[in-house]
């Protein structure tokens, strides 16, 4: 790579990125700017400042991005009822474009000519970070140490850290056997026993949710108020986007909601098993579909479902900043103008049950849909012509002797 003068590093303060920090300083003889994001991962971010200072970093960014994350990334994604491969709520995927955006903003502010991240060469995150970076700053240099160095085991990283006096904790609390990623939307677990697809996940792995068997024996009722497709209040109390999600995480976790054990297809080609806890997101998805069920036109709803598969794939594979994702987002957002109202849910032992939905913009007409006398609101005789017209092409084919089986 051409000469690098200053690098902005996505820095957590953990072993991997602390080693990367020193490795960048030594390998490229460059100045390193650290960026640590608070996305609601539930860990203290300030210790990263002390570690960076101890390693000679002069420019340190620690940003609370929780509101921006939920408002500008999570909520827009949930307007589309987004699910990857039928199950995954994209908790890791949706955080990466925001981190990439902030890396580029800091690079512009500090005059850095490169960015760096700690994603490995096997995963999706390297693609997500770098596609976002190139979309926002085409000429930026990207340094991905895991694709360059030979420190390919935790033990080698530990040895490197000790050799270079990098402040780490070799002894202390027991390290989790899983590779984990967390933000306000979810926490994920990979590796360890999960690499055997037949081995059941361990109960003590889960951090956010109670086991459904241990959840309360009494159901929790909850009302979610929607405006233009986004939740603006819980049980009538107005809340910011981040507060909404944090509250739903807490309530959902207490009721054993949001656990998932899946094998997904990574963009780089391999299959990967992961376990996820997404309590708030699971509640949001069910509630959003419920409010849309009474406020969206049928064909708009069906078209949204068709587009969602592509939209989910774009987010999963790192194309959040692509023109096609932006185009789809405009269509999705336009569909949400009338998605207003209240959804009532019952949460019970891992289940999210819709018990009511209402809206001033509802397209549900009880006078037409009733099983009782509709007083002439709907003429059932009209159905005969409707059915004959829709059967016409099949009748023609049958008259021609076309066989169906």
Curated annotation (Swiss-Prot):
Signal sequence interval, chain numbering: none
Predominant place of localization: cytoplasm
Binding site for ATP: 10-18, 37, 118
Any one Gene Ontology BP term: argininosuccinate metabolic process
Pathway: Amino-acid biosynthesis; L-arginine biosynthesis; L-arginine from L-ornithine and carbamoyl phosphate: step 2/3
Binding site for L-citrulline: 88, 93, 124, 128, 179, 188, 264, 276
Positions bound to L-aspartate: 120, 124-125
Keywords: Amino-acid biosynthesis, Arginine biosynthesis, ATP-binding, Cytoplasm, Ligase, Nucleotide-binding
UniProt GO cellular component terms: cytoplasm
GO molecular function annotations of the record: argininosuccinate synthase activity; ATP binding
CDD domains: ASS
Stored NCBIfam families: argG (TIGR00032), PRK00509.1 (NF001770)
Family: Belongs to the argininosuccinate synthase family. Type 1 subfamily.
Assembly and interaction partners: Homotetramer.
Name of the protein this chain belongs to: Argininosuccinate synthase
Organism: Pseudomonas syringae pv. tomato (strain ATCC BAA-871 / DC3000)
């Amino acid at each position: 790579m051409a000469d690098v003068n200053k690098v902005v590093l996505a820095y957590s303060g953990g072993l991997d990125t602390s080693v990367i920090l020193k490795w960048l300083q030594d390998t490229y003889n460059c100045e390193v700017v650290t960026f640590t994001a608070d996305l609601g991962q539930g860990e203290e971010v300030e210790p990263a400042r002390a570690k960076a200072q101890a390693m000679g970093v002069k420019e340190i960014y620690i940003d609370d991005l929780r509101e921006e994350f939920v408002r500008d990334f999570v909520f827009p994604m949930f307007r589309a009822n987004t699910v990857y491969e039928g199950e995954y709520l994209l908790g890791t995927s949706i955080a990466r474009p925001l981190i990439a955006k902030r890396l580029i903003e800091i690079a512009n502010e500090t005059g850095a000519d490169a960015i760096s991240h700690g994603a490995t060469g096997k995963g999706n995150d390297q693609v997500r970070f770098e596609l976002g970076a190139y979309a926002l700053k085409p000429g930026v240099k990207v340094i991905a140490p895991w694709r360059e160095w030979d420190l390919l085991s935790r033990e080698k990283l530990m040895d490197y850290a000790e050799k270079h006096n990098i402040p780490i904790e070799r002894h202390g609390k027991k390290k989790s056997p899983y590779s984990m990623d967390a933000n306000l939307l979810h926490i994920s677990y990979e590796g360890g026993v999960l690499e055997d697809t037949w081995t059941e996940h361990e109960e003590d792995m889960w951090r956010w949710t109670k086991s459904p068997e241990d959840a309360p024996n009494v159901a929790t009722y909850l009302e979610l108020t929607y405006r233009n497709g986004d939740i603006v209040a819980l049980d009538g109390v107005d809340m910011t986007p981040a507060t909404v999600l944090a509250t739903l995480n807490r309530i959902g976790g207490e009721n054993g909601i949001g656990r998932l054990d899946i094998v997904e297809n990574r963009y780089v080609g391999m299959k990967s098993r992961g376990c996820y806890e997404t309590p708030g997101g699971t509640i949001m998805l069910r509630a959003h579909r419920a409010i849309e069920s009474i406020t969206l036109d049928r064909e708009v709803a069906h078209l949204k479902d068709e587009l969602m598969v592509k939209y989910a794939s774009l987010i999963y594979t790192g194309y959040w900043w692509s023109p096609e994702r932006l185009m789809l987002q405009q269509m999705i957002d336009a569909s949400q103008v009338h998605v207003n109202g209240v959804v009532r849910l019952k949460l019970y032992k891992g289940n999210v049950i819709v018990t009511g939905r209402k809206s001033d913009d509802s397209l549900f007409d009880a006078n037409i849909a009733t099983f009782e006398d509709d007083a002439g609101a709907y003429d059932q005789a009209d159905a005969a012509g409707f059915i004959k017209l829709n059967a016409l092409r099949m009748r023609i084919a049958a008259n021609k002797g076309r066989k169906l089986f």
